[in-house]
């Protein structure tokens, strides 16, 4: 016979697996539709019209029209496409299901149109809302927080193709006690994350690792080098943290989201012309292209890092629906490659992984997630002790510093009043 603790853990196992599978399928559906629309906008349509897809006019035009389209969705859809991600943490409170169609459409348009944001925040928001709404009907005795945790764990597992990220994130939020050990609390979320990851793996495998030269023996000087690289990435990220709420307040003085996002799309188009096509979109495929190309100089990598960081801030401040983690990883890769080009004596594995750690730490303020992203982009077990040590001064630098988020009290009134 199973112990009562084991029976308690098994109670949510089936719902957890179902939520993990559903979270992955929703992610896959959204990404597939966005991919088809992206191919239409950036491959077939310019080819039909006889225009180069990297033409400045085309880049500016598509991003401006994308901004206007997203603005129209936010202005006129029920629920205004959910909350502004610039004002929300990665895992937030459930939103009304009526806001989800507009949120999904706004996300797909942004992903396909080349906006420098990832899918993570809106997808987690959608899955939490559905899990809470459906779960409350089927199992009303289970509280909303449990459904929120299961949906976010399943989505994180699906996004990264592994339950490890969910385990790391929730190990610091689901505190154990003398009565309920931590792993009892983690059991159902890990089931959801594993189901989400395995379902994603049936359709495609998220590819984060970069072909960077293997790092061998760790030296004491490498720790100092890694700490300096992380500090540089943190400094760059804190510039974005300072800019985001100010730009957000300035742009939203116009109140009408069609104008705000249209102007935001225009600015993103201009940044895209300067940075080139590799600086567009969420950044995961583009960072693979950047590393494989090997045609950039120190100044070229620096320009890409600055453009992508600026595009991230503009997209978030404008109110585009998307997450900030994936483009931040691109910024970290560009910064790391730039620093390696500038000081070749420091291995690229150190500069890239420590830059990712620093910039993701600024964006998420989550040490485990930052370590995870650095480790999966530069997969080398020799780096793990170094990254753990470098995390310590990086965390000290950010202690008490503002988050990359707009103060909720500064949010504009609903667009119903416009």
Curated annotation (Swiss-Prot):
Pfam families: Voltage_CLC
Record GO terms (molecular function): chloride transmembrane transporter activity; monoatomic ion channel activity
Keywords: Cell membrane, Ion channel, Ion transport, Membrane, Transmembrane, Transmembrane helix, Transport
Cellular component GO terms held in the UniProt record: plasma membrane
TM stretches of this protein: 10-30, 54-74, 99-119, 120-140, 149-169, 186-206, 223-243, 258-278, 300-320, 322-342, 343-363, 371-391
Location of the protein in the cell: Cell membrane
Membrane topology classification: Multi-pass membrane protein
Disulfide bonds: none
SUPFAM superfamilies for this protein: Clc chloride channel
InterPro entries: Chloride_channel_YfeO (IPR022969), Cl-channel_core (IPR014743), ClC (IPR001807), ClC-type_chloride_channel (IPR050368)
Classification via Gene3D superfamilies: Clc chloride channel
Superkingdom per UniProt: Bacteria
Listed HAMAP family: CLC_YfeO
Family that this chain belongs to: Belongs to the chloride channel (TC 2.A.49) family.
Name of this chain's protein: Putative ion-transport protein YfeO
Protein's gene: yfeO
């Amino acid at each position: 016979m199973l112990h009562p603790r084991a029976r308690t853990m098994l109670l949510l196992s089936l719902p957890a697996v179902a939520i993990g599978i559903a979270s992955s399928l929703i992610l896959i559906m959204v990404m597939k539709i966005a991919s088809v629309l992206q191919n239409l906008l950036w491959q077939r349509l310019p080819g039909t019209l006889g225009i180069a897809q990297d033409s400045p006019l085309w880049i500016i035009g598509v991003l401006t029209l994308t901004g206007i389209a997203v603005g129209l969705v936010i202005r006129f859809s029920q629920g205004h496409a959910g909350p502004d991600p610039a004002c929300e943490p990665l895992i937030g409170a459930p939103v009304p299901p009526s806001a989800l169609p507009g949120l999904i459409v706004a996300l797909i348009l942004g992903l396909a149109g080349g906006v420098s944001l990832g899918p993570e925040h809106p997808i987690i928001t959608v899955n939490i809302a559905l899990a809470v709404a459906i779960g409350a009907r089927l199992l009303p005795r289970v509280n909303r927080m449990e459904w929120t945790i299961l949906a976010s764990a399943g989505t994180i597992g699906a996004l990264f193709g592994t339950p490890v990220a969910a385990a790391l994130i929730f190990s610091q939020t689901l505190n154990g006690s003398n009565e309920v050990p931590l792993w009892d609390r983690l059991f159902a979320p890990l089931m959801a994350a594993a189901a989400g990851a395995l379902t994603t793996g049936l359709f495609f495998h998220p590819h984060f690792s970069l072909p960077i030269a293997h790092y061998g023996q760790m030296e004491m000087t490498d720790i100092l080098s890694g700490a300096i690289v992380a500090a540089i990435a943190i400094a760059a990220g804190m510039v974005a943290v300072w800019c985001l709420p100010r730009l957000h307040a300035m742009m939203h003085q116009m109140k009408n989201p069609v104008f705000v996002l249209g102007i935001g799309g225009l600015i993103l188009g201009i940044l895209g012309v300067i940075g080139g096509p590799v600086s567009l979109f969420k950044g995961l495929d583009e960072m693979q292209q950047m590393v494989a190309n090997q045609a950039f100089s120190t100044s070229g990598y620096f320009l890409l890092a600055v453009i992508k960081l600026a595009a991230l801030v503009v997209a978030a401040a404008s109110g585009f629906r998307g997450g900030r983690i994936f483009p931040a990883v691109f910024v970290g890769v560009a910064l790391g490659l730039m620093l390696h080009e500038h000081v070749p004596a420091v291995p690229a594995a150190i500069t890239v992984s420590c830059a990712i750690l620093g910039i993701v730490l600024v964006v998420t303020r989550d040490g485990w997630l930052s370590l995870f992203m650095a480790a999966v982009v530069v997969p080398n077990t020799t780096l793990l002790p170094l990254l753990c040590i470098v995390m310590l001064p990086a965390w000290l630098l950010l202690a008490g510093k503002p988050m990359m988020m707009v103060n909720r009290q500064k949010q504009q009134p609903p667009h119903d009043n416009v």
